[in-house]
UniProtKB/Swiss-Prot annotation:
Region forming the signal peptide: 1-21
InterPro entries given in the database record: Toxin_22
Classification of source organism: Eukaryota, Metazoa, Ecdysozoa, Arthropoda, Chelicerata
Known role: Probable ion channel inhibitor.
Listed name of the protein: U11-theraphotoxin-Hhn1a
Swiss-Prot/TrEMBL keywords: Disulfide bond, Ion channel impairing toxin, Knottin, Secreted, Signal, Toxin
Cross-referenced Pfam families: Toxin_22
Location(s) in or outside the cell: Secreted
Removed propeptide positions: 22-74
Organism: Cyriopagopus hainanus
């Protein structure tokens, strides 16, 4: 009966000592995994940041295109039909009714002052 107790005690001591080693080993493995996880998170964060920067650049480009397209239209040159309510004749020109008789596509044209 004494040998059974000694054997049991020996097995118990070995199990506890090996269990502690496994616990320390598990702790180290967890630290390594969290460090790897942090590096993966950093990589994912950088990738997301790059995509967001590309998206912002694209949106800013679209805004600048809109501002270019929304500029005032170019002026109308001499002898070109114009609208009497909204004359867009160039400077030095006036939107007037033609002095010549005939059939005209538009009734007003840009002429020099």
């Amino acid at each position: 009966m004494n040998t059974v107790r000694v054997t049991f005690l020996l097995v118990f001591v070995l199990a506890v000592s090996l269990g502690q080693a496994d616990k320390d080993e598990n702790r180290m493995e967890m630290q390594e995994k969290t460090e790897q996880g942090k590096s993966y998170l950093d990589f994912a964060e950088n990738l997301l940041l790059q995509k967001l920067e590309e998206l912002v650049a694209k949106l800013l480009e679209e805004d600048s295109e809109e501002s270019r397209n929304s500029r005032q239209k170019r002026c109308i040159g001499e002898g070109v039909p114009c609208d009497e309510n909204d004359p867009r004749c160039c400077s030095g020109l006036v939107c007037l009714k033609p002095t010549l008789h005939g059939i005209w596509y538009k009734s007003y044209y840009c002429y020099k002052k």
